[in-house]
């Protein structure tokens, strides 16, 4: 009888990527099939995030619900992974002793062995260590799930912003070897993937070892990925202003596959607050990066992250942030009221900002961003945009849904054969969360660039012989 696996995922795109790898790993090693019904699952895994407020309590509430299932089904395996597991592993083991497996983001590749061990062991099996790049060396070959794919190119963060737990839960920055990244993307391209989103906590800090001992920069990696035939759209997230050098800006000038949309977190427009956050840049330095980007790619749209009501934030500090939002003219944002993360320096900062003031500031910020976003959408009316067809429209299954490079969803009438292809659309209507358009041309009339076929890239990638000796064919 086939064993069933349920994975519940909270948090960032990196967690989504990790969860997909858990499913592939347990499917390949143990034949587990995914289910969405916890009652029929043999293994329940919770992939956690510690960024949001009350993350720990949210975990224990979910585990409490799963405990009722385990009481009725003693052989049920419950596992907790992700950043909360790394941060609170011992506490989880003490407060929820019925949890069988506790693993960190860097040890998910050991899940099959840990689950087997838990079945013959009454004690919780826990591994929240940081074995650097070992995780990627032990994952199964990638499986495409649609026309877009996430590919993790580096892990961790070495910036230590005062409010952030990532360096403590995912470790220091570690980059995957260049040929491993290219090999994974080439495999995905062979399976029909057209768009790749490169992932990392500080993705533009990538410094990947090459087969000859040199180091590949993030800018060079972008150009190499874009040259793979079939990969006609390239994104990356999340980037850091400190690592956004002129070499990356130059890629926007010469690499059309790189989208005209960038998520570049700034957190605040006040230099005083940025210093308290230990963000190694000023508001002017951030705007300088944006000016260079818009010179290289005039139509680029920018999104960002903002923390409102950071301890000590005055009304002037907040208005500095609002000025930055208007000056840069952000298209989107992820914005939240500050909430202290246990173990971070900012958790000990005194904060006397009234709760209503926090809510009012967040509402004002989000209203301004929404106003700007709506204006950008209206400006797209009667223009022609290239979009990747992702599947049927969620509003009307008789229509298709495509995504533009500036992250707008466009619904249009077209043949299902267009799914997985690029189309040019004339934008006819603008709504709050989407656009509507009509088909202008299909991919066969576009002349998309062909540089290196996926099979050629795979053949050029490092391989190991029976003795474990690695060779690389340049």
Swiss-Prot record:
Location within or outside the cell: Cytoplasm
Keywords assigned: 4Fe-4S, Cytoplasm, Iron, Iron-sulfur, Metal-binding, S-adenosyl-L-methionine, Transferase, tRNA processing
Cofactor binding note of this UniProt entry: Binds 2 [4Fe-4S] clusters. One cluster is coordinated with 3 cysteines and an exchangeable S-adenosyl-L-methionine.
Domain TRAM: 378-441
Record carries keyword Nuclease: no
Enzyme Commission number, as recorded: 2.8.4.3
MTTase N-terminal domain ranges (all copies): 3-120
Subunit structure of this chain's protein: Monomer.
Family the UniProt entry places it in: Belongs to the methylthiotransferase family. MiaB subfamily.
Database matches in PANTHER family: CDK5 REGULATORY SUBUNIT-ASSOCIATED PROTEIN 1, MITOCHONDRIAL TRNA METHYLTHIOTRANSFERASE CDK5RAP1
Protein purpose: Catalyzes the methylthiolation of N6-(dimethylallyl)adenosine (i(6)A), leading to the formation of 2-methylthio-N6-(dimethylallyl)adenosine (ms(2)i(6)A) at position 37 in tRNAs that read codons beginning with uridine.
Protein name (database record): tRNA-2-methylthio-N(6)-dimethylallyladenosine synthase
């Amino acid at each position: 009888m086939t064993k069933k696996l349920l994975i519940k995922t909270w948090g960032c795109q990196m967690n989504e990527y990790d969860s997909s790898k858990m499913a592939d790993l347990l499917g390949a090693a143990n034949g587990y099939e995914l289910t969405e019904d916890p009652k029929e699952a043999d293994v329940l895994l919770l992939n956690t995030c510690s960024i949001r407020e009350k993350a720990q309590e949210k975990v224990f509430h979910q585990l409490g619900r799963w405990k009722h299932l385990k009481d009725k089904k003693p052989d049920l395996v419950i596992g907790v992974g992700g950043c909360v597991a790394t941060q609170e592993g011992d506490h989880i083991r003490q407060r929820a002793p019925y949890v069988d497996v506790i693993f960190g983001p860097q040890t998910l590749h050991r899940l099959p062995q840990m689950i087997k061990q838990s079945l013959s062991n009454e004690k919780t099996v826990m591994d929240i260590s940081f074995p650097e790049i070992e995780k990627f060396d032990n994952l199964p070959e990638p499986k495409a799930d649609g026309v877009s794919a996430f590919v993790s190119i580096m892990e961790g963060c070495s910036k230590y912003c005062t409010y952030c737990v990532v360096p403590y839960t995912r470790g220091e920055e570690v980059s995957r070897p260049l040929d491993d990244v290219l090999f994974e993307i080439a495999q995905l391209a062979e399976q029909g993937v057209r768009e790749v989103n490169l992932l990392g906590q500080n993705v533009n800090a990538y410094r990947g070892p090459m087969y000859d001992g040199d180091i590949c920069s993030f800018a060079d990696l972008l150009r190499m990925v874009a040259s793979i035939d079939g990969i006609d759209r390239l994104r990356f997230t999340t980037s850091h202003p400190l690592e956004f050098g002129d070499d990356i800006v130059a890629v926007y000038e010469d690499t059309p596959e790189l989208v005209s949309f960038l998520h570049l977190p700034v957190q605040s427009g006040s230099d005083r607050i940025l210093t308290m956050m230990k963000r190694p840049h000023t508001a002017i330095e951030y705007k300088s990066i944006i000016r260079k980007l818009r010179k290289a790619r005039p139509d680029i749209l920018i999104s960002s992250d903002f923390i409102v009501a950071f301890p000590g934030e005055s009304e002037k500090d907040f208005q500095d942030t609002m000025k930055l939002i208007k000056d840069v003219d952000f298209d989107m944002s992820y914005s939240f009221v500050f909430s202290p993360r246990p173990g971070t320096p900012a958790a000990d900062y005194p904060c006397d900002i009234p709760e209503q003031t926090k809510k009012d500031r967040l509402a004002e910020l989000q209203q301004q961003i929404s106003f700007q976003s709506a204006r950008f959408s209206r400006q797209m009316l009667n223009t022609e945009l290239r979009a990747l067809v992702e599947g049927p429209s969620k509003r009307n299954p008789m229509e298709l849904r495509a995504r533009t490079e500036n992250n707008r969803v466009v619904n249009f009438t077209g043949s299902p054969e267009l799914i997985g292809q690029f189309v040019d659309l004339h934008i006819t209507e603008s709504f709050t969360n989407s656009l509507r358009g009509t088909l202008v041309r299909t991919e066969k009339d576009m002349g998309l660039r062909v540089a290196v076929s996926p099979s050629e890239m795979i053949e050029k990638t490092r391989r190991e012989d029976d003795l474990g000796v690695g060779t690389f064919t340049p």
